[in-house]
Amino acid sequence: AASDVYKRQKDGRDLDWETELSSANPTEPVPVDSWDPLYILYTSGTTGLPKGVVRDNGGHAVAMRYSMKTIYNAKPGDVYWAASDVGWVVGHSYIVYAPLLHGCTTVVYEGKPVKTPDPGAFWRMIEEHQINHFFTAPTAFRAVRKEDPDAEFLKKYDISSLKGLFLAGERLDPPTYDWLQNIL
């Protein structure tokens, strides 16, 4: 329960966001050059040792903005959700940077597509946050399909805000594709 979180807080280590925010001073943005590093993210190491990949500010920002408009057809003001691991380059880019650069609201979610508490977690999030664009991996929907093959949990939620579903990161198997086509 939420009250349990407060019981586990430790003085001197854990800070209350609202308290800290109320005493914070505004800070001006720091200008950077387009070629300055934005972040370093390490690859998985599937082809050997993990390698640090450095993204620059300008090029990455342009690519993210372009993809939001031309690939995802997102409009400023839309709600975009990438249900991915923020440590993966796609999750990092489409949770943190792309939606905000394009003027969208981004949804940050901690949990699995099933058993949090049930296979309706994705549908519940779409309804609650009026999500317009949803991006995840096929594995997530394979898990949902396994737990809820008849999409009974979907029927509990209004997902009419959803304009697009995008899947990437691995092969989308035909049974999962067909299941999604049939329920959506």
Predicted features, each with a name:
Residues 1-4, 61:
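Positively charged, low-complexity/disordered segments
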Residues 3-15, 76-77, 102, 110-184:
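Conserved adenylate-forming
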Residues 11-15, 21-42, 49, 59-64, ...:
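Conserved pre-ATP/AMP-binding loop-to-beta segment of ANL
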Residues 37, 43-46, 68, 80, ...:
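Conserved S/T- and glycine-rich ATP-binding loop of Class I adenylate-forming
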Residues 85:
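Residue(s) in the substrate-gating loop at a strand-loop-helix junction
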Residues 91-107:
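Conserved short alpha-helical elements in the N-terminal third of ANL/AMP-binding
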